[in-house]
Every structure is written in structure tokens, then in C-alpha cells.
């Protein structure tokens, strides 16, 4: 792209860009059309005309005095305006994605992508981008990345308080290329290099524990997760499962469609989750109860279990389908929708708050466990898991009780 421009060109294009943003967002691709019929900001304090006029003044001054005018990148300037518009809303979940970020975002829900094979989350206390899971035999594992690593830099990009989706877009890239990842581990800064590869996301793992208690771990709710979960559930049933543990610890969430379809394999007839938008309109997602799971069940959660994980745990808790074991979850009780902007970019916007079957809002609160147990690391036995032990004990107790009552 040619960056050098004639006098006044930058001012004209930027003013036009902002006017387009203020007049409305035309969202195509089968989503919805949003337009501004009021002609001003919702507050009524700042009009389009005032903003456009001030921007004209800023651009006139930049055109007249800015030393590096020939280096102005109008495309980057435009992207900055779009990003700034959403950032100024003060909602960390409403985000504008440029073309590269949109491509990476779409890949992240497909079940396969070119990357390093690690799951990231935002630490609930520090807001740092943190690795919570490293896929087995992945480039991330081969590079030495570990769960708990705090991301500081991706190549030359400072991570800081960047949106998680942006950080992920930096990590992903063409198969066979290297990415330099700088992490903080136990107070020590480490610079590691991973070679990107095609990652087939295994979001579900499972095994039969002692006393015929099935264990299913779900790392995230992607497009591929439903089939993997159903396969695990069916196989454990064939093995004679007497009770079940679903482990959602460190699961940051994912697709609403995926989690509700999974819950249809477990819940009785009724509401799975309901949402309420800005106008008070309520929508319900329901279950017909055809596949209700009636055996003892526990769901493991922690402070990193968020979004779709909280829909799952909140629903099974409300119906009494499972006991929730662990600590209070993250507390993300709002729904976002991806909206195609028609030019390879997209907008992720918060459109509703969701409620559990009993009408509970968990936004900013989280799902509280029925059996609270903090994870305790055992230096002598690093593989020990006191939270899992408690879940096993909880399910076993219910199995024993149901056997006695027969």
C-alpha cells in the first residue's frame, strides 16, 4: 500500500471513515443490520457533526505540522479508529477484529488450525494472558511451554493487557514457521521458540476411574467438542459406567450451540439457558429430556471455568443433575455475537446477559460449588489432585447411597 499522500488526503479519508462509523454499522453475512437512527451518540451529549468537526481540526493540524506526514498509514489509521470506537465502550468483550484477527478467530472455532497447541485465558485477578493447557505432543509442549506460564511477548508484540483473541492471532500462523514466545515462570523470564504446525484440537479426553466412575475432561467448547463428548459418554456407558465426573477446570468457554447440545445429552426436559437483551427480550434454549442422565454425577470447576463452562455447570446444578465441586467460577454471564462487516473484518459485541434454568445471573458472581475445595499442590506427589479426589468421593458416596436404597 502506498503510504505517501497529497496534502489533505489523510484528513479527508479519516473524516469519511469516522462518519461511516457514526452513521451506522452495516453488518452483513447473515447476521444483522444495525443502524443509527438517532443521528448521535446515545447520551445525546456529542453529535456526529461535533465529532466530525473536531476531527477535521485535528487532521488540519496534523497536515500542517506533523513531521512524519509521509509515513502516515491510512489503513492503520482507519483500523485504529474502529478499534478505538469499541474500546471506548468500556466492555472488554466487545471487540473489533481486523482482517487477520478475524481469520484467526474463525479458525479458532473450527477444530483445526495452524499454531502451537496451547489454551490461554485471562487471569481473573491479574488480567494477564496465561497458559492453562498445553496439548500433548504439540509444538508448545516440544518448545517447553507449561500451564501457568504468563505470556509477556509474542515475537516483538508486547502482550500486556491485549485482548486474548489478539494474542492468539499473534501466536497462530503459517505451518512450519517459528514463533518466539517470552513467558514469565516462577519469577523468571524465559524465551522459547515453537514451530507452528497443524493442530487437530482434542478438546475432550476421558477414562474410566476406579469403581466404574467415568471421567471426561473438556478443555473448551469448540465445533468439534460435541462429537468428542458424545463419543466419550457412549464409550464409558458401554464400559459399564456407574457414575460420571465432567472436568471443566481451566475451560474458558466457547460456542453456545456446542454447550447446549452437550447438555441435551444430560438434562431433563426444560430450559437449558435463557438470555435477555437490551430491550428486555428473553429467549430460551430448551431440552426435550430424551437423553436425561440419571446416574450420580459431579462437575469439577475452578476460577478459570468461564462462559460456556458456567452455562454447563449452572444448568446441571439447577436441575440437581450433578454436584459442583471445586471453587467459584469466573463469572462471565454475558453473550457475544460475531457480526460480519462484509470486508473480511468482524465485530464481536455483547448482546445479552444469560440466566441459568432457575433464573440466576452469574455475571460477575460465578457459579458457587456445592462442595468447595481449593486445589492444593503436593510437592511430593505433583500428579496428586485433591479436587478430583473429592469429586470421586462425592460420586462414590451417591452411588453407594443409591445402591442401599434399591
Give residue ranges: language-model regions.
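Intrinsically disordered, Ser/Thr/Pro/Gly-rich linkers and terminal tails that flank
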Residues: 1-122, 163-208, 220, 230, ...
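Cleft-lining beta-strand/loop regions that shape enzyme active-site pockets
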Residues: 2-5, 132, 141-143, 147, ...
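PDZ/PDZ-like domain segments forming the peptide/carboxylate-binding groove
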Residues: 16, 20, 44, 48, ...
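A residue-level signal for beta-strand positions that form part of recognition/binding surfaces
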Residues: 115-117, 128, 178, 191, ...
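Short, well-ordered strand-loop elements centered on a beta-strand within folded domains, enriched
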Residues: 126-135, 188-193, 273, 346-349, ...
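Conserved P-loop NTPase
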Residues: 336-341, 347-378
Amino acid at each position: 500500500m502506498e503510504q505517501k499522500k497529497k496534502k489533505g488526503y489523510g484528513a479527508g479519508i479519516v473524516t469519511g471513515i469516522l462518519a461511516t462509523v457514526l452513521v451506522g454499522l452495516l453488518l452483513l453475512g447473515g447476521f444483522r443490520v444495525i443502524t443509527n437512527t438517532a443521528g448521535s451518540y446515545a447520551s445525546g451529549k456529542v453529535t456526529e457533526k461535533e465529532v466530525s468537526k473536531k476531527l477535521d481540526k485535528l487532521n488540519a493540524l496534523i497536515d500542517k505540522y506533523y513531521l512524519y506526514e509521509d509515513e502516515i498509514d491510512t489503513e492503520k489509521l482507519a483500523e485504529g479508529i474502529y478499534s478505538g470506537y469499541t474500546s471506548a465502550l468500556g466492555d472488554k468483550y466487545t471487540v473489533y477484529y481486523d482482517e487477520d484477527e478475524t481469520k484467526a478467530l474463525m479458525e479458532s472455532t473450527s477444530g483445526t488450525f495452524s499454531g502451537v497447541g496451547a489454551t490461554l485465558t485471562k487471569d481473573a485477578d491479574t488480567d494477564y494472558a496465561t497458559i492453562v493447557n498445553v496439548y500433548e505432543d504439540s509444538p508448545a509442549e516440544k518448545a517447553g511451554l507449561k500451564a501457568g506460564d504468563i505470556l509477556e511477548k509474542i515475537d516483538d508484540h508486547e502482550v500486556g493487557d491485549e485482548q486474548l483473541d489478539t494474542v492468539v492471532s499473534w501466536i497462530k500462523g503459517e505451518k512450519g514457521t517459528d514463533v518466539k514466545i517470552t513467558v514469565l515462570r516462577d519469577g523468571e523470564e524465559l524465551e522459547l521458540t515453537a514451530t507452528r504446525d497443524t493442530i487437530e484440537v482434542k478438546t475432550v479426553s476421558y477414562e474410566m476411574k476406579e469403581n466404574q466412575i467415568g471421567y471426561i475432561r473438556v478443555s473448551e467448547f469448540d465445533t468439534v467438542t460435541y462429537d468428542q463428548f458424545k463419543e466419550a459418554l457412549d464409550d464409558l456407558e458401554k464400559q459399564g459406567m456407574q457414575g460420571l465426573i465432567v472436568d471443566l477446570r481451566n475451560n474458558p468457554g466457547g460456542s453456545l450451540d456446542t454447550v447446549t447440545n452437550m447438555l441435551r445429552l444430560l438434562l431433563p426436559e426444560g430450559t437449558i439457558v435463557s438470555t435477555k437483551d437490551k430491550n428486555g427480550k428473553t429467549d430460551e434454549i430448551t431440552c426435550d429430556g430424551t437423553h436425561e442422565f440419571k446416574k450420580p454425577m459431579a462437575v469439577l470447576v475452578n476460577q478459570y471455568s468461564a462462559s460456556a463452562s458456567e452455562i454447563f455447570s449452572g444448568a446441571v446444578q439447577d436441575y440437581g443433575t450433578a454436584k459442583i465441586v471445586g471453587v467459584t467460577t469466573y463469572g462471565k454471564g454475558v453473550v457475544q455475537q460475531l457480526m460480519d462487516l462484509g470486508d473480511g473484518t468482524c465485530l464481536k459485541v455483547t448482546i445479552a446477559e444469560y440466566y441459568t434454568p432457575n433464573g440466576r445471573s452469574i455475571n460477575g458472581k460465578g457459579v458457587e460449588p456445592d462442595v468447595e475445595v481449593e486445589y492444593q499442590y503436593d510437592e511430593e506427589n505433583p500428579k496428586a489432585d485433591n479436587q478430583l479426589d473429592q469429586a470421586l468421593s462425592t460420586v462414590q458416596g451417591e452411588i453407594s447411597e443409591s445402591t442401599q436404597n434399591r
